[in-house]
Amino acid sequence: MRNKNTPIAAEGYPFVAIAGFITVVLALLAWKVLAAFFLVVTLFVVFFFRNPQRITPGDENAVVSPADGVVIYLGNARESHLDEEMMKISIFMSVFNVHINRVPVSGRVVDRFYLPGKFLDVRDERATFENEQNGLVLETARGVKMVVVQVAGLIARRIVCYPKIGDMLQRGQRYGLIRFGSRLDVYLPKNVELRVSMGDKTVAGETILGILP
């Protein structure tokens, strides 16, 4: 992503600017209640687009979480693009989580796909098949393939994903975001050594989801 060292993600600048401008105008007009309301809105937008630095674990076989959130699904599932049974881990991001997404493993982007769809609540498993989504297929230097999918939700209707096919990505690198709450699905080889359980909280770029064989 372009906003590597800024405290606020660049994608949030327009929202912060608009909310801040409205706040200033209302304050100058002495509309105190509305000015106070939009000040709160401005602070929330800044909070939502915060861009914290993360320390990624050193183990190259470790798969790190692509998102801040909570594990809401863990189990075998068929991944349609690789057409095989894989270990699926779904992470739910609320509006209060950091929404910048990070690369789970170092490797090359061998495929990228976009599927238009609905905007169901992402905690509903139907969202896997019916919601708008954007996915990357990554291949590590050892030839291991995995898939990470950004799923749009009831409120989050804007997926941002920068990598293109052929790009080389580093584990923990920022690669996109989903605006205002959603879900990330990670598909790993079935023989991955899991390090998370249902209900666990995750930190993007830091929490180890599993160890590749």
From Swiss-Prot:
Heterodimer of a large membrane-associated beta subunit and a small pyruvoyl-containing alpha subunit. It comes from Geotalea uraniireducens (strain Rf4) (Geobacter uraniireducens). Is synthesized initially as an inactive proenzyme. Formation of the active enzyme involves a self-maturation process in which the active site pyruvoyl group is generated from an internal serine residue via an autocatalytic post-translational modification. Two non-identical subunits are generated from the proenzyme in this reaction, and the pyruvate is formed at the N-terminus of the alpha chain, which is derived from the carboxyl end of the proenzyme. It catalyses: a 1,2-diacyl-sn-glycero-3-phospho-L-serine + H(+) = a 1,2-diacyl-sn-glycero-3-phosphoethanolamine + CO2. This is Phosphatidylserine decarboxylase proenzyme. The record marks 181-182 as: Cleavage (non-hydrolytic). Signal peptide: none annotated. Its EC number is 4.1.1.65. Its cofactor is pyruvate. Catalyzes the formation of phosphatidylethanolamine (PtdEtn) from phosphatidylserine (PtdSer). GO terms for cellular component: plasma membrane. PANTHER family: ARCHAETIDYLSERINE DECARBOXYLASE PROENZYME-RELATED. Pfam families: PS_Dcarbxylase (PF02666). Binds 1 pyruvoyl group covalently per subunit.
